[in-house]
């Protein structure tokens, strides 16, 4: 197995309210090997700030990964369609300035089982159309948009999305593998990782578990080794990749309510039937 560099996702330190430079200092003091800023660095950081951040990371031998992208073209508050081109261009240009070749993109739209706008399959097609339009820009900047595995789509869906975009591993789209989010889409995390393995370019490494609830169950993050995610198998799979992968540890509070007992809920997951 190839050696990994192990760092953190900046959201892990959210309660501390650290600036990007303070986050790098935390990584240095705690012997982390890098930081993924999966949410970017706030509103429109200028180029001089980004260059100084990249230089500081390099001086301290830290890997740096970037985020702030989105891949579901719907407003999470209203559910209405919206253009995601500008936010992805900004994130990709920031990554390019930093000398980083990936941008983590979140799925801010409805969860797969939620109604409207449209069906999950229709939302997938609209997402693919939006991402196809980003291809030339991402190629020009040499940046891969890493779609985080979240509750908007299953890994089966994401493979269909890549097919709709006529893209292959190593091109302008990839995966940010969140090891526990598969629990929210009723997938086995290790099997989900295997499905999208060639596409994985960045990671959110975390353990998790589920608890029964009145309407189904709740998924939540757990201390590594205490949950149900087979991290040993997943990391073993990542170690077979030809390209280098960093392991960015992510921890966060809260859980996701999955209404598995609701009428018609299983129909939202045809690949798992």
Regions found by a protein language model. Name each.
Residues 1-100, 270-273:
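N-terminal pre-domain/capping segments
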Residues 4-11, 35-37, 64-69, 103-105, ...:
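Hydrophobic faces of well-ordered beta-strands that scaffold small-molecule active sites
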Residues 7-10, 37-39, 75-77, 118-120, ...:
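A short, structure-level motif marking secondary-structure boundaries and short turns
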Residues 8, 27, 35, 57, ...:
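Conserved, mostly hydrophobic/aromatic
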Residues 13-18, 37-49, 72-84, 111-115, ...:
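Acidic-and-aromatic substrate-binding clefts and catalytic sites of carbohydrate-active enzymes
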Residues 28-38, 92-95, 127, 131, ...:
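A short, hydrophobic secondary-structure junction motif
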């Amino acid at each position: 197995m190839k050696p990994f560099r192990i760092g953190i996702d900046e959201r892990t330190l959210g309660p501390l309210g650290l600036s990007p430079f303070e986050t790098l200092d935390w990584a240095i003091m705690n012997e982390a090997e890098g930081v993924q800023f999966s949410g970017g660095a706030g509103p429109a950081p200028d180029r001089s700030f980004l260059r100084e951040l990249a230089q500081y990371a390099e001086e301290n031998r830290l890997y740096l990964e970037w985020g702030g992208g989105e891949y579901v073209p719907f407003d999470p508050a209203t559910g209405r369609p919206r253009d995601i081109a500008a936010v992805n261009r900004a994130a990709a240009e920031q990554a390019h300035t930093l000398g980083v070749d990936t941008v983590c993109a979140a799925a801010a739209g409805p969860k797969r089982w939620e109604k409207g706008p449209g069906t999950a399959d229709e939302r997938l097609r609209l997402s693919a159309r939006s991402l196809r339009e980003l291809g030339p820009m991402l190629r020009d900047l040499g940046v891969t948009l890493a779609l985080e595995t979240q509750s908007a789509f299953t890994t089966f869906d994401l493979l269909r999305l890549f097919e709709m975009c006529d893209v292959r591993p190593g091109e302008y789209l990839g995966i940010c593998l969140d090891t526990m989010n598969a629990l929210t889409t009723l997938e086995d995390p290790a099997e989900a990782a295997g499905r999208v393995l060639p596409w994985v370019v960045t990671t959110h490494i975390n353990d998790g578990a589920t608890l029964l609830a009145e309407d189904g169950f709740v998924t939540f993050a757990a201390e590594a080794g205490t949950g149900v995610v087979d991290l040993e198998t997943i990391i073993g799979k990542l170690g077979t990749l030809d390209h280098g992968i960093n392991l960015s540890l992510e921890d966060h509070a809260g859980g996701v309510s999955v209404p598995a007992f609701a009428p018609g809920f299983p129909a939202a997951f045809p690949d798992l039937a």
